[in-house]
């Protein structure tokens, strides 16, 4: 039971009147305070929003490359990558004393086609895989025709086949591409003439984003049996294959009607792997560093090393030797009018020989379509070999012999290689060594640094020395009569 409580109101002493502000001044002060708070809030939101916007723009332009500090590398690739050098040796070209026996390009291509399960992306210059394309009746075209037949079987089996090809500037056979379209393949023509005043000169395949071929061989039956070619097939190397797919995706985008080169490529095309941060891979059981370069520079999204920069880096880092095998060598912009001198590579080779004492060997192709002006530039390089300066540069011309029937095959019987090897690095590309191929024309290269003997680098060195020491290599002062009419540079 609660006790009965009595409540009594407390008497609060009266306060003395204070000096109060007039009501209009109080309201003015409150309004000013409220306005100041709103201004402060707006300023804070503006700063935060600006910071968020700049961060987004930063990431959009540079992708996630800048998540890595200057001394950090992307995570290594743990795929068991296997690299195999493949060659096309023209019929009748024999190396009786050579110990190197590499798989043929056609064997490699047919093997890749047989193993394709989900996708095949091909970047190509042109397509002439059959006798009908070249108006010939050559038995040696059989290998190219078989490649085309196998390509036509893929799309009906559920393989997504995409082909990016250079848009021709004039009449060019289209029967192969039409046959592939009818089989279910997708084809896009890239108008490099409109985009950069060049062509799509790239030659690579990507299979299931796991395996790839990259090299000098075109989609041409002659590239399998009548032209000397070199390339590399990478098996079980999805890290590199996916990165090569990014280069293909850029071509695929540019193959759309009305497309243009973006001023800034979207992040989708960016790469983490380049000259500064190459991919760490296990290649043929040995640690290696690798990355893919591309040309021309406008086709290089954030992170992608331009092809010329990659090539010059190999030259500049050589300390013992530089061996180069390439079809054309011209320190000019040969397809520009008027012609321009373009000494970027030439300067690098001369500097390597003169300043660092590097042994330089150039094996340049010579055939009926060689640019005559090459001879003067090659003689200039060879003239640096001198006992007083101790510069050691040698130049030879590689001539593929042809009998009467072989000589009638159009645009055949030539060494079409495009590679370089040093004591440190391997460079396998798709471009000739003259200016326009790096400034206007689309090309791709694979760069690998690997220590030790028995790796990709030493295998490529062995191929170069086999060719250099062969009876098909000739000094610049060789009599033209000794090689017949096959060479325009003697």
Curated annotation (Swiss-Prot):
Binding site residues for Mg(2+): 438
Domain of life: Eukaryota
EC number: 3.1.16.1, 3.1.4.-
Cellular component terms per the entry's GO annotation: early endosome membrane; endoplasmic reticulum membrane; Golgi membrane; late endosome membrane; lysosomal lumen; lysosomal membrane
Disulfide bonds: 77-239, 81-237, 366-487
Active site: 201, 201 (proton donor), 203, 208, 416 (nucleophile)
Residue numbers marked as site, Cleavage: 71-72
Claim: Coiled coil is one of the keywords in the record: no
Record's comment describing the protein's domains: The catalytic domain contains two conserved PLD phosphodiesterase HxK(x4)D(E) motifs that accomodate the phosphate group of the nucleic acid substrates, with one nucleophile histidine residue forming a phosphohistidine intermediate and the other histidine protonating the leaving 5'-OH ssDNA/RNA fragment, resulting in the cleavage of the phosphodiester bond. The homodimer has two independent catalytic domains arranged at the dimer interface.
Name listed for the protein in its UniProt record: 5'-3' exonuclease PLD3
Organism name: Pongo abelii (Sumatran orangutan)
Gene name linked to the record: PLD3
